[in-house]
Amino acid sequence: MYIRSVTESDLTSLYKLVERAPAGLTSLPRDQKILHEKIMQSVESEQAASGQEWQRILLVLFDPVEQCITGVSGLEREKSTAPHYTVDNKLECLRLDTTAISPVKLGSLLLGDTHRRRGFGGLLSKSRFLYLASLPEELSEYIHAELRGWVNNDDASPFWETLGYSLYGDNFSAIDHFRGSQPDAFAFHHLAAHEVPFSLLNQEVLAKMGQVHPDTKNALRMLEQENFGRTCHVDILDGGPIVRATTAEIATIRNSVICPVTEVSTNDLLSDRWMISNSHSKAFRACLHPAALREGMLHVHSQTLSTLKIQPGERVRAILKQSSKQGNIHD
């Protein structure tokens, strides 16, 4: 199992993965045409000549035995108009805000059920930061993530059903799909500059506002461990929290090492597992393999070299795997 950038031939496999995802994964709607557009954006961004041309990257967890995608994570450039609510506790209201939290955001983190609790959730999430560090120029000083808010067992959002439905007349599933497929049209046609007093919201909505769905708690914990902090903003649809970090202070980037690799025999037992990525932003790969850092060199087996498509002596970025729980989904 390893991480690589998405390719056009991954469309069918990616669609099958997304089809099984719960409601609320706005950035990857169950629509093959839209998924194809996002894949092609990623392919084009991977080969972009400059950071200004970069729009999106989708990284997939690939199973070479089954020849299928078992997870996906992503980064994307935020639109200049990015609607969300700002929670104003002093005035006890929600204010619609369209100023981007940061120029780049995390998104599209989804791991199939069969590969949870095997360390792949951490690899899938952290690979985005390893990819960021591989780029020749920093995309943004800051980066943020919008986490999935509370959605009940019927895939309905109490936040939206209480607030949005009364204002705009669409149920959560329909409006969530519309935002994912036509974000600009969504902002223009479905949002008005209303201030929403807390008094219009019931106690359940107020209690859940800014809280993550149970399936997303581990993802939030992981981001907090990466030095992401909560903001005063929440998602426009489900009221989920929005967190932000300084790119250079992200723990995976700050604590990783850059060093050359050397091949050792399989008889050399390497007891620690490392998250390792190559330094090729235009042919990015990452894996979770046994390795040992000795005298400034990362000792690996031949399988690791083959997986990363590198030669002995090439430089890699690596970080020792921690034993913390990892999240499985956020948007």
Model features per residue range: what roles?
Residues 2-14:
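A short beta-loop-alpha structural element at the N-terminal edge
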Residues 27-70, 74-82:
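Active-site rim helix/loop that mediates acceptor-substrate recognition in acyltransferases
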Residues 56, 69, 75-80, 138-295, ...:
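Extended, composition-driven regions rather than compact fold-specific motifs
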Residues 74-108, 173-184:
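Conserved acyl-donor/pantetheine-binding loop and adjacent beta-alpha core of acyl/acetyltransferases
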Residues 108-111, 116-132:
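Conserved acetyl-CoA-binding loop-helix of GNAT-fold acetyltransferases
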Residues 289-314:
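Short beta-strand-centered segments at strand-helix junctions
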Residues 316-318:
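A generic structural signal for residues embedded in beta-strands
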Residues 320-326:
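Short, charged beta-turn/beta-strand-edge "cap" motif at the junction between a beta-strand
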